[in-house]
Structures are given as C-alpha cells and as structure tokens.
C-alpha cells in the first residue's frame, strides 16, 4: 500500500503499522525476585487471543541459570488460560502455519491447544536469536519467544539487533539502575513507547500516548495513531507572512479572542498584541 501511494500522480501521506514484537527485557534480579511475572505476562500475551498489536511477542531475560525456571512457569501460566477463537479462520490458519515453521527452532517450543487456537511459547539462546533474523518478526496470535541471555552483554547485543517497535518494556529492580543506564539508550532508538515495570497491551487514549515507532513498526515514527496528538496526521504546517490582521484565522489575530498561549517573538504569552 505504501508503494502504491507513492506511485500516485499526487502522493499523499500514508500511516500504517506493519509489525512489532514489543520486546520485554527482564533483568536477572527481577527474574529471580518477582514471582508474579509469569502470570502477568501470560495474561498479556494471550489477551484477545494474542491479536493485540502491542502483544509482548519477545521476552528477553537475563538469567545465569541455563535451565531457567522462568520459562517453565510462564508456560504453565499460559496453559492455565482458556482462549477464545481467533477473529477469522484465515488468521488462525496463518498462525498455525507460523507455529509449524517455528517448530524447527534450535531451541524448545511449548504448545498448548485451546479451543480453536494454540497458545505457544518458544525458548532460544541469545546467540541463536542473533544469528536468525526472522525470529524477530511478528507472529500474530497467542505466541511469544523467550530469548535467554546468560549475561548483560548478551542482552545488549539482542537489543541492538532489533528493528523498530511500537513498545519496549524494561522490568528491573532498584539495584539495576546502572544496567538500565546502558540498556535504555539502545531501547530509545528502537521503540515509540517505553514501559517500566508493566505490560504493553494497555493503550490509554490520552495526551501522553505515543502509538507508533521506527520502521517497520510504522511508516512514520513522528506520529501517533492513538491519543489527542493523532490528529496531527491530518494537518500540515501553514504560515501567513505580512497578512492583514482581519484576514488571519481568529486564533492568530492580534486580539487573541480565545486567550490561547502563543509564541510571539520567541516568548510564550496569551495576551493580545
């Protein structure tokens, strides 16, 4: 669609969301100290049968334990949930095709049949994830992939190899501040919204929301599709030079009838001129 728009005789802006795995980075202290994480993440992964664009489809954990119990507990939490059918049979068919492809992973994939859908959880090493770029592509449905990092250096490498995302989540403890100072700048270049100690599936409609991100999360990371600032997608800049006061829009007239905050000669003011 983007290519078609650019081929128009008069091209127009095109705003699209094209794919995001919404990575969740869990530092080792958090993995070991917060026993509620598997339940919270299982609910987020399977919300709406995994059909939310903000679903956490990638969970990057730092855990020195090679047989991480976190993956086992997350799989058990997903097993305990009953899921509704997906919204369309073709979507469900495509999802199952993706699961069959993922079964060839050099890792483990845990599946659980639920009504018309399959909740699934994969587990691979950081090294294999970095060497296999298509593992970072979105799988639409109740699936998530755990990437096991044995140390912080591996987590930083995983973060660096990711493409643009709608969201990225950092789960940590107060003791992890120094590690976050290194990780956060990498994440800032990858995502439109960064969460701390939460899950990304909730998208509030308010002035602060940013729902968009660097390519391929969206076609233009400067805009949001949710919240009051979403209106800017349908606006364009326009200036009036040496225009008679009476011909200006009311919001720009010297009298400032709406008492708006305006920048006049570099100073914010709501007074009349």
Tell me the role of every PLM-derived stretch:
Residues 49-52, 56, 83-93, 109-113, ...:
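Flexible, glycine/charged-enriched surface loops at secondary-structure junctions
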Residues 16-18, 28, 63, 125, ...:
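Active-site proximal loops enriched in glycine and acidic residues that flank catalytic Cys/His/Asp
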């Amino acid at each position: 669609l983007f290519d078609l728009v650019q081929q128009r005789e008069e091209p127009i802006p095109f705003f699209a969301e094209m794919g995001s795995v919404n990575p969740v980075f869990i530092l080792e202290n958090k993995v070991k100290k917060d026993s509620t994480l598997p339940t919270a993440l299982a609910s987020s992964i399977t919300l709406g049968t995994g059909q939310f664009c903000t679903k956490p489809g990638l969970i990057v954990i730092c855990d020195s334990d090679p047989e991480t119990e976190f993956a086992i507990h997350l799989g058990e939490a997903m097993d305990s949930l009953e899921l509704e059918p997906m919204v369309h049979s073709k979507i469900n068919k495509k999802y199952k095709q993706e699961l069959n492809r993922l079964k060839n992973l050099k890792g483990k994939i845990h599946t659980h049949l639920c009504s018309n859908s399959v909740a699934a959880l994969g587990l691979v090493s950081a090294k294999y994830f970095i060497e296999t770029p298509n593992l970072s592509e979105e799988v639409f449905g109740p699936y998530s992939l755990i990437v096991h990092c044995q140390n912080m250096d591996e987590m930083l490498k995983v973060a660096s190899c990711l493409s643009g995302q709608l969201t990225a989540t950092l789960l940590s403890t107060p003791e992890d501040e120094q590690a976050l100072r290194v990780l956060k700048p990498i994440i800032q270049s990858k995502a439109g919204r960064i969460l701390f100690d939460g899950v990304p599936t909730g998208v509030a409609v308010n002035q602060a929301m940013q729902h968009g991100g660097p390519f391929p999360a969206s076609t233009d990371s400067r805009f949001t599709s949710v919240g009051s600032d979403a209106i800017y997608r349908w606006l364009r800049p326009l200036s009036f030079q040496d225009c008679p006061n009476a011909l200006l829009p009311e919001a720009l007239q010297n009298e400032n009838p709406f008492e708006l905050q305006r920048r006049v000669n570099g100073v914010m003011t709501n007074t009349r001129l």
